[in-house]
């Protein structure tokens, strides 16, 4: 019981730290949705399939809010699948500030960010251009109608039909996601505390050549603790750099959790989750092959 209460408290505090940024993110979404419909239309009319570039750049910012925004926009079909994946793969959550605090790893951080951004853009373009004809139309994303039809959420009005302030809608969505993320954080915290970080390190070390595959799986956990764990294991020498890259590529912060909450198609969500994991694992294994051949 003591262990449960400790993890419960830590999960609550860690998740609560996300609330201000999540609220601002949702407030931005509501503001854009209600006040800038024409600008959205003009932006989308300019060619949304190139969105992988700004998506990857925004993903570099160590904040979970951008992946949450991307998930909401994809659920509303405002952005393409390629843009969504670019944001996910470029996101590094808490790994960046953690590595920034260690001057000895600044060179590795620079290499990490370059690899992630380039790879995120490449995957995004592959999905939006090369594989566009193969993917089902409902999965491609991207909005081609009129901006006044873009609705990331529902109409914000009371029973009398009066418009509600955007902050109320933003607050409600923030609290809904808070509960969802808190549940994930609690379960993950109990697993880590119950099994132990050493067990995770031993498991990753025993995987050998396929370590990136497992690291990519760990990265899928929608909690900043996952990116912190991967970074700490790398710093401690239990994780190879290729595995760190794989794990941080799949570490889209709360993006996947928000996607599962907002996108109604569980099949699409499952495919995107698997695609995120596969993209990270493939990159990690490919890096290991290159190192093995040329090192």
Task: Show the residue positions of the predicted features.
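Selected transmembrane alpha-helices and immediately adjacent juxtamembrane segments
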Residues: 1-31, 38, 111-212, 273-295
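Short amphipathic alpha-helical segments
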Residues: 25-29, 41, 51, 67, ...
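Interfacial loop-to-transmembrane junctions
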Residues: 36, 260-279
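Active-site-flanking structural segment that lines cofactor/substrate pockets
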Residues: 39-66
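Cytoplasmic-side transmembrane-helix entry/capping segments in multi-pass membrane proteins
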Residues: 45-46, 83-88, 270-275
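Membrane-interfacial helix-loop connectors
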Residues: 58-114, 192-263
């Amino acid at each position: 019981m003591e262990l449960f209460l400790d993890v419960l408290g830590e999960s609550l505090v860690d998740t609560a730290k996300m609330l201000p940024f999540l609220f601002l993110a949702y407030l931005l979404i509501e503001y854009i949705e209600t006040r800038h419909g024409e600008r959205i239309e003009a932006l989308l009319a300019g060619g949304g399939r190139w969105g992988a570039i700004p998506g990857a750049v925004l993903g570099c910012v160590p904040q979970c809010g951008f992946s949450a925004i991307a998930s909401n926009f994809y659920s509303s079909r405002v952005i393409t699948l390629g843009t969504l994946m670019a944001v996910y793969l470029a996101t590094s959550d808490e790994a960046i500030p953690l590595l920034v605090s260690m001057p000895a790893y600044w060179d590795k951080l620079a290499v990490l960010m370059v690899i992630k951004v380039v790879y995120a853009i490449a995957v995004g373009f592959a999905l939006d251009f090369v594989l566009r004809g193969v993917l089902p139309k409902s999965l491609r994303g991207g909005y081609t109608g009129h901006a006044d039809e873009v609705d990331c959420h529902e109409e914000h009005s009371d029973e009398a039909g009066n418009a509600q302030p955007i902050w109320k809608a933003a607050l409600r969505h923030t609290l809904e996601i808070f509960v969802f993320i808190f549940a994930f954080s609690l379960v993950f915290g109990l697993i880590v505390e119950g099994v132990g970080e050493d067990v995770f390190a031993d498991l990753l070390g025993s995987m050998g050549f396929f370590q990136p595959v497992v690291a990519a799986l760990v990265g899928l956990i929608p909690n900043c603790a996952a990116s912190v764990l991967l970074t700490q294991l790398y710093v401690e020498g239990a994780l190879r750099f290729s595995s760190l890259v794989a794990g941080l590529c799949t570490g889209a912060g709360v993006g996947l959790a928000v996607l599962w909450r907002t996108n109604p198609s569980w099949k699409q969500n499952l495919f995107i989750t698997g695609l995120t994991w596969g993209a990270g694992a493939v990159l990690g294994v490919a890096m290991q092959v290159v190192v093995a051949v040329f090192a």
